[in-house]
Curated annotation (Swiss-Prot):
Homodimer. Polymerizes to form a dynamic ring structure in a strictly GTP-dependent manner. Interacts directly with several other division proteins. Residues 344-354 have a biased composition (Acidic residues). Essential cell division protein that forms a contractile ring structure (Z ring) at the future cell division site. The regulation of the ring assembly controls the timing and the location of cell division. One of the functions of the FtsZ ring is to recruit other cell division proteins to the septum to produce a new cell wall between the dividing cells. Binds GTP and shows GTPase activity. This is Cell division protein FtsZ 1.
């Protein structure tokens, strides 16, 4: 048989099977590289209480950092990283309710703070305004983070009126500096908690304030980091919170037949949301429940959208929380609002709290 007549033989190449585990590993690496890195920094006594509580309840995908001038308090706090600022200045004894000492302590430890914030995409800074460390150091930390190109959102409480005029003056000083150095400052007026629950014992009132801080930070963080029914993209959050000034928060919940609409109404009419929201530039809606229906989510979003500026950017997400059972909870963060707690002319830094102009943090009479 000649070569030309030889039968043709098909040479079969064995198929190369790529193990599924290798593909999954590669996908995991890609997801790890692209996911948003979110840091939560608790500053001072109240801020450290907040991050301590966050460590207890758990926050998916966030690095928790505790910062204080008081070594004894810092020792008790749970966090992924702890930073004692101003070691030379305060010797670990605290700031003595003096924001200037808190500010200088943060500046002394600027390199350590900068190293701790390296690599973040978004930084939450939480504190209670009115004391020394949180009031003085939080704006310095915000400035560091923002200069590093990180989306910087401060979540702060204002003191109860019963805490005295000095803490109110300190809070004025700290708030205007935070607005200057943060992309967004979410303000929670503690006095407004008395409208929500006027008969609360004082110790419980402070715990409720801490819990609202935790809900705000955890809620926004996990809409980005935690798998849910509807997640938010980090770029969506950036669009609503970048360079937005003052923001306020409202929370509502209901388990009635009209639970979705009632929860949305409660959130927008919450005493904590103490502003006219009609001119707001943005809104972030966090919906949570065990069995949220798409129709209910639509009712909530439409209700909020109708009540803000027609040009406002509205983003939303849904987290499934089995422990809520039949309850729907709605948290709304309204950004770019005009607040009675701070006005544009207050944004120039003051030399000391005592030299601040006579601008009252006006709390409506209860």
């Amino acid at each position: 048989m000649s070569l030309e007549e030889s039968p043709k033989r098909k040479i079969r190449c064995p198929e190369v099977q790529v193990p599924q585990s290798n593909i999954d590993e590669e996908l995991e690496k890609i997801v790890e590289q692209i996911k948003a890195r979110i840091y939560v920094v608790g500053v001072g006594g109240a801020g450290c209480n907040t991050v301590n509580r966050m460590m207890e309840v758990g926050v998916t995908g966030a690095k928790i950092i505790a910062v204080n001038t008081d070594a004894q308090d810092l020792l008790k706090v749970k966090a992924h990283q702890k930073i004692l600022i101003g070691k030379e200045l305060t010797r670990g004894l605290g700031a003595g309710n003096d924001p200037k000492i808190g500010e200088e302590a943060a500046k002394e430890s600027e390199r350590e703070l900068r190293d701790a914030l390296e690599g973040a995409d978004m930084v939450f800074i939480t504190c209670g305004l009115g004391g020394g460390t949180g009031t003085g150091a939080a704006p310095v930390i915000a400035e560091i983070a923002r200069k590093m190109g990180e989306l910087t959102v401060s979540v702060v409480t204002l003191p109860f009126t019963m805490e005295g005029i000095r803490r109110a003056k300190n809070a004025e000083y700290g708030l205007k500096r935070l607005v200057k150095y943060s992309d967004t400052v979410i303000v929670i007026p503690n006095d407004k908690l008395l409208e929500v629950a006027p008969k609360l014992p004082i110790q419980m009132a402070f715990k409720v304030a801490d819990e609202i801080l935790v809900q705000a930070v955890k809620g926004i963080t996990e809409l980005i980091t935690k798998p849910g029914l509807v997640n938010l993209d980090f770029n969506d959050v950036r669009a609503v919170m970048k360079d937005r000034g003052v923001a306020m928060i409202g929370i509502g919940e209901s388990d009635s037949e009209k639970r979705a609409l009632e929860a949305a109404e409660q959130a927008l009419n919450s005493p904590l949301l103490d502003v006219d929201i009609s001119g707001a530039s943005g809104a972030l809606i966090h919906i949570s429940g065990a069995d949220v229906k798409l129709e209910e989510a639509q009712q909530i979003i439409e209700y909020v959208t109708r009540n803000v500026d027609s040009k406002a950017q509205v983003i939303w997400g849904i987290q499934l929380e089995p422990e809520l059972e039949k309850t729907i909870r709605v948290m709304v963060v309204i950004t770019g609002v005009t607040s009675r707690y701070i006005t544009p002319e207050e944004e120039t830094p003051l030399e000391t709290p005592e030299e601040s102009p006579s601008i009252e943090i006006s709390i409506p009479e209860l």
